[in-house]
A protein has these predicted regions:
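PLD/PLD-like phosphodiesterase catalytic module centered on the HKD motif
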Residues: 1-50, 54-174
Length: 174
């Protein structure tokens, strides 16, 4: 199933307690990040003291939802040394944290004994799983959703295992 950004925003707004996101790729080819990634490679960095220069709609959504008491957590399983893309992503993750997300990083070598799903996913209120399907170079292809309780339980357990071992963003240095 494909999904528009509006549909995804509505889905996030419908969450009552928690939304967790597990990311496991070392690179993404997301259209709306291509320009920023190129600028980052040329030395541009976001200024943490100038939110007007980096605030974006996703951060408004996170702030809106977390203000209602919803917990949004993101965990990233990454290879070390990190790829350029992960270094880029790390450089702006302070923006996610500023909006209310909690973010942790887990070096892949510390995840070898964990049973992780084959794709990145969001888990909403512990019930609905949305898998994000990417092609071999990291371009988003589509999403698959399921409310299967066994799949949701597997994803919840996988996320919590990564979260427990992960390093909070503020303490993970690249």
């Amino acid at each position: 199933m494909s999904q528009s950004l509006t549909d995804f925003s509505d889905l996030v707004r419908s969450v009552e307690k928690s939304a967790v996101h597990l990311e496991m790729r070392d690179g993404y080819g997301i259209d709306n990040e291509i320009k920023g990634f190129a600028e980052w490679k040329q030395g541009h960095r976001l200024n943490p003291h100038d939110p007007a220069s980096w605030w974006r709609p996703w951060l408004d959504l996170v702030q809106e939802v977390t203000a209602k008491g919803v917990l949004i957590r993101r965990a990233r399983v990454i290879s070390e040394p990190v790829s350029d893309y992960i270094a880029f992503e790390h450089s702006f993750t302070f923006t996610n944290v500023a909006a209310g997300e909690q973010v942790r990083w887990l070096p892949r070598r510390q995840a070898s004994d964990l049973a992780l799903p084959g794709n990145d996913f969001w888990l909403f209120d512990g019930k609905l799983v949305q898998f994000n399907i990417f092609d071999g170079v990291g371009r988003w292809v589509h999403t698959d959703q399921t409310g299967d309780p066994a799949v949701a339980a597997h994803c919840a357990a996988a996320f919590e295992a990564v979260w427990e071992r992960g390093v909070p963003h503020e303490k993970y240095a690249i």
